[in-house]
């Protein structure tokens, strides 16, 4: 009873903080000058991280098993993973570009998990026989950590594509503008060109940072995903007598692995780095959500215990 009450309190606290942080993010998005509000939102995410940690520990103690047995618990752990990835660059101060992605990801995931939409599966139950194994922690935690890192890295790649597209479009319009302007206002061309070059240099630096961090975060996520798939294969052999069954979840996890393996392969070729590899990562972003959420909508296969409740089907 005590753990249930504590879990209920932590859930409401985390949802309240998330709601406040979302409001602050919207305000800072509209008004960039409010620096103190941005700092408050960052601290709010850190407080949310500790609330989620307390929630997971409380649920673990009360249920007697690691809280990764259903969709609700996996969403909470996914939010915790986003928050963990967010905290590291926040304290380093020199990787703020990564925190711009991880912050909103943690906020939205935690907000969805604790909003009441998944009320039917909030209560922890007895594990199904297939999940009563020591491999639960190893397999599922590695998969969720892999999803979190791959999603963050993919979002950085999406941002890279957007900025690159806007940069190329402005380059086209600016070049035409300079040609027209040179016929009428020759003395202003040098000044405008220097301003344009400075702005273009800043964008180029930003694109390089996005490319740098997307590659490293995706590499980390790919490592987690590989460990998760391998440990899952060993667990499947123990539980079902076969390393691989081409279950919908397994199939899409394999597709996800292939897509990001292609991404990492493109990174070995200098000509394919940047926008080309970012396109592959952007495709991977969609594939991950199909693997994590889309397959759950089917509610079939050996991983059906992680599906939505019956009211959603």
UniProtKB/Swiss-Prot annotation:
Its main location: plastid. Keywords: Chloroplast, Cytochrome c-type biogenesis, Membrane, Plastid, Thylakoid, Transmembrane, Transmembrane helix. The chain crosses the membrane at residues 9-29, 44-64, 71-91, 111-131, 143-163, 217-237, 244-264, 278-298. InterPro entries: Cyt_c_assembly (IPR002541), Cyt_c_biogenesis_CcsA (IPR017562), Cyt_c_biogenesis_CcsA/CcmC (IPR045062). GO terms for molecular function: heme binding. It is found in: Plastid, Chloroplast thylakoid membrane. One of its GO terms (cellular component) is plasma membrane. GO terms for biological process: cytochrome complex assembly. It holds the Pfam family Cytochrom_C_asm. NCBIfam families: cytochr_II_ccsB (TIGR03144). Required during biogenesis of c-type cytochromes (cytochrome c6 and cytochrome f) at the step of heme attachment. Belongs to the CcmF/CycK/Ccl1/NrfE/CcsA family. May interact with Ccs1. PANTHER family: CYTOCHROME B_B6 PROTEIN-RELATED (PTHR30071:SF1), HEME EXPORTER PROTEIN C (PTHR30071). HAMAP family: CytC_CcsA. This is Cytochrome c biogenesis protein CcsA.
């Amino acid at each position: 009873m005590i753990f249930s009450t504590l879990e209920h309190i932590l859930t409401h606290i985390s949802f309240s903080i998330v709601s406040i942080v979302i409001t602050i993010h919207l305000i800072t998005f509209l008004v960039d000058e409010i620096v103190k509000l941005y700092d408050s939102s960052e601290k709010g995410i850190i407080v949310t991280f500790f609330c989620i940690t307390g929630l997971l520990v409380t649920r673990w103690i009360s249920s007697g098993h690691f809280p990764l047995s259903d969709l609700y618990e996996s969403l909470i752990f996914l939010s915790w993973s986003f928050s963990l990835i967010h905290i590291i660059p926040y304290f380093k101060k020199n990787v703020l570009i990564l925190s711009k992605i991880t912050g909103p990801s943690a906020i939205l995931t935690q907000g969805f998990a604790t909003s009441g939409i998944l009320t039917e599966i909030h209560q922890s139950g007895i594990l199904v026989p297939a999940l009563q194994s020591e491999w639960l922690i190893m397999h599922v935690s590695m998969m969720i950590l892999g999803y979190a890192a791959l999603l963050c890295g993919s979002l950085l790649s999406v941002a890279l594509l957007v900025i690159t597209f806007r940069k190329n479009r402005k380059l086209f319009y600016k070049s035409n503008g300079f040609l027209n302007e040179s016929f009428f206002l020759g003395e202003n061309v040098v000044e405008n060109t220097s301003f344009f070059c400075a702005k273009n240099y800043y964008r180029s630096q930003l694109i390089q940072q996005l490319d740098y961090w997307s590659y490293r975060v995706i590499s980390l996520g790919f490592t987690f995903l590989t460990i998760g798939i391998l440990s899952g294969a060993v667990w499947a052999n123990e539980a079902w007598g076969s390393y691989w069954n081409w279950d919908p979840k397994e199939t899409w996890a394999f597709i996800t692995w292939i897509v990001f393996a292609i991404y990492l392969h493109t990174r070995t070729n200098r000509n394919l780095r940047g926008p080309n590899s970012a396109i592959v990562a952007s495709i991977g972003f969609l594939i991950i959500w199909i693997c994590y959420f889309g397959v759950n909508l089917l509610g079939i296969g050996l991983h059906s215990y992680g599906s939505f409740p019956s009211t959603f089907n």
